[in-house]
């Protein structure tokens, strides 16, 4: 029983982590909408979720030689397989950010994040109800 509960929470924990990382990527795309030569990137959420749930995690240890280097919270970004967003709307300056697509994906990602939070909240509420009798 506890193993099943752990699996449910692990799934949603991984989904929340990936949603958070995707939100950072989408935010970077939106922030760089006017940056000449910027190439919009994303990752396949379903593939990355399956990879984190069903395969052994590979840990990358980075050596910090300066306090200005990336901190620990960014290390998981290196494990994601980011891909360039294919678009037929390339600006004259080489920028490939499509703001309509980015806004829609940002909204969809936010909905996934909120859905996982609501599911976790309801599961905890149900467990508390059962335990109280």
From Swiss-Prot:
InterPro entries from the UniProt entry: Flag_bb_rod_N (IPR001444), Flagellar_basal_body_rod_CS (IPR019776), FlgB (IPR006300)
PANTHER family, per the entry: FLAGELLAR BASAL BODY ROD PROTEIN FLGB (PTHR30435:SF12), FLAGELLAR PROTEIN (PTHR30435)
User: What protein does this entry describe?
Assistant: Flagellar basal body rod protein FlgB
Summarize the subunit comment.
The basal body constitutes a major portion of the flagellar organelle and consists of a number of rings mounted on a central rod. In Gram-negative bacteria, at least four rings, L, P, S and M are present, whereas Gram-positive bacteria lack the L and P rings. The rod consists of about 26 subunits of FlgG in the distal portion, and FlgB, FlgC and FlgF build up the proximal portion of the rod with about 6 subunits each.
Q: Which NCBIfam families match?
A: FlgB
Transferase as a keyword? no
Provide the protein's localization: Bacterial flagellum basal body
- Keyword line: Bacterial flagellum
A single Pfam family, by name?
Flg_bb_rod
The record ties this protein, via PROSITE patterns, to: FLAGELLA_BB_ROD
Q: What's an example GO cellular component term for this entry?
A: bacterial-type flagellum basal body, rod
Q: What does this protein do?
A: Structural component of flagellum, the bacterial motility apparatus. Part of the rod structure of flagellar basal body.
Top-level taxon of the source organism: Bacteria
Any one GO biological process: bacterial-type flagellum-dependent cell motility
Family recorded in the similarity comment: Belongs to the flagella basal body rod proteins family.
């Amino acid at each position: 029983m506890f193993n099943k509960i752990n699996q449910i929470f692990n799934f949603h924990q991984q989904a929340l982590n990936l949603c958070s990382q995707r939100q950072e990527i989408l935010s970077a795309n939106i922030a760089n909408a006017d940056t000449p030569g910027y190439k919009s990137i994303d990752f396949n959420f379903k593939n990355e979720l399956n990879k984190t749930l069903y395969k052994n995690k590979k840990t990358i240890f980075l050596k910090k030689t300066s306090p200005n280097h990336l901190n620990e919270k960014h290390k998981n970004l290196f494990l994601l397989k980011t891909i360039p967003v294919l678009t037929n709307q390339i600006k004259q300056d080489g920028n490939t950010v499509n703001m309509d697509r980015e806004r829609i994906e940002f909204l969809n990602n936010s909905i996934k994040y909120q859905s996982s939070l609501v599911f976790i909240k309801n599961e905890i509420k149900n467990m508390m109800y059962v335990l109280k009798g």
